Amino acid sequence: MTNKNAYAQSGVDVEAGYEVVERIKKHVARTERAGVMGALGGFGGMFDLSKTGVKEPVLISGTDGVGTKLMLAIKYDKHDTIGQDCVAMCVNDIIAAGAEPLYFLDYVATXKNEPAKLEQVVAGVAEGCVQAGAALIGGETAEMPGMYGEDDYDLAGFAVGVAEKSQIIDGSKVVEGDVLLGLVSSGIHSNGYSLVRRVFADYTGEEVLPELEGKKLKEVLLEPTRIYVKAVLPLIKEELVNGIAHITGGGFIENVPRMFADDLAAEIDESKVPVLPIFKALEKYGQIKHEEMFEIFNMGVGLMLAVSPENVERVKELLDEAVYEIGRIVKKENESVIIK
């Protein structure tokens, strides 16, 4: 073993790493926004907060991954949307606190650098950033032979946003009588996939199940997570929203109570929830108890808003999409979420 080839012989391809950087530059360039300083490849990404025009800025950050949905991306060899999932999981969390996303960083760890595949992953991250209005200002690609299988990789992201101090959404404004509005999800989004994979373990992904309205199973399972930023930001700017819940792991039961005080509860009319076909299929083929579905999945509502009754029509007008009045805030007696 010569010194020149020592790293390569240990399984790390430095040249492939350089190629990845060159391939992703054009995708990163798509995400440019006011405030970005410096060029890709520095030791740290820089952002000029004064360019946001926010008078009393509060930075709000979030980090997340996409769980075992990655395993389906690997199984079906489709890597161009999983990055959007990663961005969505982060920015939807910080928008729930009232933040406008400013910038994003990603982390990809793999056992073997495959430049074409990793370019697809980062292209998806960039697309998510464009949808969220966030700049992709840095990241890390780690080649770790022995830590992962040769075809495996993991993906995580980190989002930072800004809110006017007076417009932070922390649940303190939610009161009894507020209306709960549901914004539709694009599908399963990025949680519950350990169960999803078990339910469909014996399927190839090419199947067109009768519940899925003509779509292949793999298309539905890898449908990228919806990014709600551009829909919700105008509502925050007009201070029309009292609370926001991003419905992720733990479904309605765990996430909805995060947007209001402990003495309140959410009363939800199940008949008003726009349940998507994939959830009906999961319940049927997985033989999952109906009530448990609401403890795991978004059931068709990826983001829930608590809105004062007098603001409901204005919110609907600004959203300009199907909005579902699915419940209201009540005084808590026993449970924090009542599904009727």
From Swiss-Prot:
Domain of life of the organism encoding this protein: Bacteria
Protein's recorded name: Phosphoribosylformylglycinamidine cyclo-ligase
Any one GO molecular function term: phosphoribosylformylglycinamidine cyclo-ligase activity
Gene source species: Streptococcus pneumoniae serotype 19F (strain G54)
Reactions listed under catalytic activity: 2-formamido-N(1)-(5-O-phospho-beta-D-ribosyl)acetamidine + ATP = 5-amino-1-(5-phospho-beta-D-ribosyl)imidazole + ADP + phosphate + H(+)
Pfam family for this entry, one: AIRS_C
GO biological process: 'de novo' IMP biosynthetic process; adenine biosynthetic process
CDD domains associated with the record: PurM
EC number, as in UniProt: 6.3.3.1
InterPro entries for the chain: PurM-like_C_dom, PurM-like_C_sf, PurM-like_N, PurM-like_N_sf, PurM_cligase
Upper lineage: Bacteria, Bacillati, Bacillota, Bacilli, Lactobacillales
Pathway(s): Purine metabolism; IMP biosynthesis via de novo pathway; 5-amino-1-(5-phospho-D-ribosyl)imidazole from N(2)-formyl-N(1)-(5-phospho-D-ribosyl)glycinamide: step 2/2
Family as reported in the entry's similarity comment: Belongs to the AIR synthase family.
Keyword Iron-sulfur in annotation: no
Keywords: ATP-binding, Cytoplasm, Ligase, Nucleotide-binding, Purine biosynthesis
One GO location term (cellular component): cytosol
Compartment list: Cytoplasm
